[in-house]
Each structure stands twice: as structure tokens, then as C-alpha cells.
């Protein structure tokens, strides 16, 4: 077994094993180069010498693959490092690198890196990536990149979707995440719900001394029995009470003709309904009250302007003070009740039609009234009073009647 020394340039590493694992991980990503990936699986870690010399060993054929990859400038260093030299450990002879670089491997690596970063892997993007991240490779032209991609498409290493290119990842590639093992579906039983399997697991034994129980096992069994009496076991072990189905009040008969319900179950209908005499007026009054809003209530519309808003304190009083509307008193009028022989007047009589309503008459003038219809031979239901102060006789009978039966009522202005 021969040894190979890889001289790395980068930050000072304290653990050479991590540097070796990073070196293998970077080269395993080139899964399209099967010889290099198989060589990474075969080599072993031998040691590390500071500041950055890595020693590996393996079969001679696999180490030769690493030398060829370094010679063709496709061998990748560990993350954060660069490979300055590579050679055998015996004489540490340096391997000369060729000027020819396989463009297929470089383009495959560029497409894989663009896919991993979530960038569009177009022809122009691939060319820019090679020119920026591969200084040892002369920037290829767009036609050379297109020809190389066409050859990769024919071999199946790269596939195209619209104008974007993607690397065909095999199933055993380290870039593909490992598939999760299918979880076995468990069947929910009564023991899972009641917790009996957790409290008292069943123990099966095939040994011949099955009935022999040691003292330690007895203590373990007592502990299990005490756990079974815990509150969770008592809660879950309660059985469900059987639900009693109440018989229906009206049993359903299937197959028979539908029978009409008995007359006693039907509600009685009043053929001659009666209502109170003022029902119509009451309904109209309620409808009028519903349609016409109350006096003083105005419909307030919302406005988007802040000038029209009125802000009240947070603690509003239960009832806001309201002012009653001042009403003007209606003028009094004189009237005489029916079936009355006496004169009745709330306000003084008005003889002059030019006077205004509600004006006060002279308090010095006294008026005398007498019922004329009482002394006439005609039968009247109402009374008629005349003022004797300024009355003139219109008939021949009235002066005699007034002279003999003058029974007046003197009413003075109050």
C-alpha cells in the first residue's frame, strides 16, 4: 500500500479528520466521473501535518485516479482550501499538470453549482460561471459551450427544460437526500386507548424456567400493579355506559296505508272570531306612530368630515336633559252646555267683531242673559240666551215675556 500526500493551503486546521471528510465530500459531488467517486470511496485517512498536509492511502489504482484528476485539474480541495501540490509520500515527486482541461467536467460542475444555488443555468450563465470560478480554464466561447452541452445531453448527464439545464442526479448520488424509511402503520386498539399495554406490558418467554420468578421480578410486578391504579389508568379504564334508546312517542308503521291523525289532536278553528270595537283604530294608530318619527328626533347621517362630529365624554349620563317645546295657549271660546238653563261663559262675550282674539273686555260693563226658548211654546232641546243690555224687541210677544218673567242671570267679568 502506497501513501499519497496532498498539500493544502488555507486556514489553520486543528482536526485533520474534518479536512479529510470535506475533501471527500467535495469530490463525491462529481458523480458523473465514476472513477473519481469510486476512488474517494476507497482511500483512507492516514494523518495530517500542520499547517495543511493531508496523508491518504489506498490501492495503487485508486491513488492513480487521484493523480490523474489532479493532473487534469478536476480534483477539488476541501472547503476553504486550495491544493498547492500532490505527490507520493516516498520521494514526494510532484505531478505535472497538463494544459488541456476537459470542458465537459467543468460545464457539468458549473450546472450542478448553479442548480444547488437556485440560479438559472442557461448557456450564458454557464459561460460566466466558468470564466469567474475556473481561472485555470480559458473562457470558452458560446459556441463551444453549446457543443459541449449537446454532447452532455446525448450522454444523459444533463437534461434541458425550456432554456434551463439541469444535472441528471442518479439515485445513489450524495446530492439526493436519503429517502425516509416508511413508518409502519400501527393499529389502534383498546389497549392503546386505555393505557393497559403501557401500565402492564405482556411479557412472553420461551425459556423452560418460565414459572420461576426472582425477588427482583416480584418487586417489578408490584410496581406495575401500583402504576395500574394511577389516576390515568382509572380514567382510561372506565367503560362506556350503554346508551338506552328511548321509544319514540309515535311509532312508525312501515308497509301500511297512512292513517289520518285523530280529530282530537287537531287544533280547533273558530269560525266566528270576535274582536273589540276599536281594533281598527288601534292598528291605524300604531301604524301611524311607527311611520312618523317622534317630534324632535332627526335622522343623523354619518359624515366623513371631522368638522361635523360631536364628541361627548366617555361616561355619558343615563338620560340627556330635554327641553319641552313652548306651546302657545289657544284662545278661549264661550259655549253653553246642553240641557242647561243657566248661562255659562268662560270668557267675556265679544260684541265687537273687530276685536282681536283673547282681548280683555271692559270690566265696568255688566251683561244680563235670559233663556228665550223656555218661555216660548215651542219645545227645544237646547237653550238660547240673549243679552238684555243691548237687545231690542223683534216681535210683539217678547216684550211682554220679558216684562213679566224677567229672570236674568247677572254675570260680571272676572
UniProtKB/Swiss-Prot annotation:
Ranges for the Winged helix Storkhead-box1 domain? 93-170
In this chain, composition skew of type Polar residues spans 332-351
One of the entry's Gene Ontology molecular-function terms is: DNA-binding transcription activator activity, RNA polymerase II-specific
Bi-partite nuclear localization signal: annotated segments: 285-295
Q: Mind listing the UniProt keywords for this protein, alphabetically?
A: Cytoplasm, Nucleus
Annotated GO biological process? anterior/posterior pattern specification; asymmetric neuroblast division; asymmetric protein localization involved in cell fate determination; cell fate determination; dopaminergic neuron differentiation; neuron apoptotic process; neuron migration; positive regulation of transcription by RNA polymerase II
Q: Which domain of life does the protein's organism represent?
A: Eukaryota
Q: Where is this region: Nuclear localization signal?
A: 321-327
Which Pfam families does the UniProt entry name for this protein?
Answer: Stork_head
Which compartment or compartments is the protein found in? Cytoplasm, Cell cortex; Nucleus; Cytoplasm
| Keyword Nucleus assigned | yes
Which PANTHER family does the record match to this protein?
FI21431P1 (PTHR22437:SF0), WINGED HELIX DOMAIN-CONTAINING PROTEIN (PTHR22437)
Task: Output this protein's name.
Answer: Stork-head box protein ham-1
Gene of origin? ham-1
Amino acid at each position: 500500500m502506497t501513501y499519497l500526500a496532498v498539500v493544502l493551503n488555507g486556514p489553520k486546521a486543528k482536526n485533520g479528520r474534518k479536512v479529510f471528510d470535506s475533501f471527500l465530500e467535495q469530490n463525491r459531488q462529481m458523480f458523473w466521473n465514476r472513477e473519481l467517486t469510486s476512488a474517494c470511496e476507497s482511500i483512507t485517512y492516514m494523518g495530517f501535518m500542520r499547517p495543511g498536509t493531508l496523508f491518504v492511502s489506498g490501492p495503487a489504482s485508486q491513488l492513480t485516479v487521484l493523480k490523474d484528476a489532479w493532473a487534469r485539474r478536476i480534483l477539488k480541495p476541501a472547503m476553504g482550501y486550495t491544493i498547492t501540490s500532490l505527490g507520493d509520500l516516498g520521494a514526494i515527486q510532484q505531478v505535472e499538470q497538463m494544459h488541456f482541461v476537459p470542458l465537459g467536467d467543468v460545464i457539468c460542475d458549473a450546472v450542478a453549482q448553479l442548480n444547488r444555488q437556485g440560479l438559472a443555468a442557461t448557456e450564458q450563465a454557464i459561460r460566466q460561471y466558468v470564466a469567474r470560478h475556473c481561472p485555470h480554464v480559458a473562457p470558452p466561447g458560446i459556441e463551444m459551450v453549446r457543443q459541449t452541452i449537446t454532447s452532455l445531453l446525448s450522454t444523459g448527464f444533463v437534461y434541458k427544460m425550456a432554456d434551463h439545464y439541469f444535472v441528471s442526479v442518479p439515485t445513489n448520488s450524495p446530492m439526493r437526500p436519503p429517502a425516509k424509511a416508511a413508518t409502519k402503520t400501527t393499529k389502534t386498539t383498546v389497549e392503546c386507548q386505555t393505557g393497559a399495554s403501557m401500565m402492564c406490558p405482556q411479557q412472553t418467554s420461551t425459556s423452560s424456567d418460565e414459572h420461576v420468578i426472582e425477588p427482583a421480578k416480584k418487586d417489578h410486578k408490584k410496581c406495575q400493579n401500583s402504576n395500574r391504579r394511577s389516576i390515568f389508568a382509572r380514567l382510561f379504564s372506565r367503560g362506556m355506559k350503554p346508551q338506552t334508546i328511548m321509544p319514540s312517542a309515535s311509532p312508525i308503521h312501515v308497509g301500511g296505508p297512512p292513517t289520518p291523525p285523530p280529530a282530537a289532536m287537531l287544533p280547533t278553528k273558530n269560525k266566528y272570531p270576535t274582536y273589540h270595537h276599536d281594533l281598527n283604530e288601534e292598528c291605524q294608530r300604531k301604524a301611524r306612530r311607527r311611520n312618523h318619527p317622534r317630534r324632535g328626533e332627526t335622522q343623523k347621517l354619518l359624515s366623513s368630515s371631522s368638522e361635523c362630529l360631536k364628541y361627548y365624554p366617555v361616561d355619558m349620563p343615563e338620560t340627556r336633559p330635554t327641553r319641552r317645546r313652548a306651546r302657545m295657549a289657544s284662545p278661549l271660546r264661550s259655549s253653553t252646555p246642553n240641557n242647561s238653563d243657566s248661562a255659562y261663559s268662560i270668557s267675556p262675550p265679544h260684541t265687537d267683531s273687530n276685536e282681536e282674539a283673547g282681548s280683555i273686555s271692559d270690566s265696568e260693563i255688566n251683561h244680563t242673559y235670559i233663556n228665550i226658548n223656555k218661555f216660548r211654546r215651542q219645545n227645544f232641546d237646547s237653550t238660547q240666551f240673549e243679552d238684555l243690555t243691548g237687545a231690542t224687541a223683534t216681535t210683539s210677544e217678547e216684550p211682554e215675556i220679558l216684562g213679566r218673567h224677567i229672570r236674568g242671570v247677572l254675570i260680571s267679568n272676572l
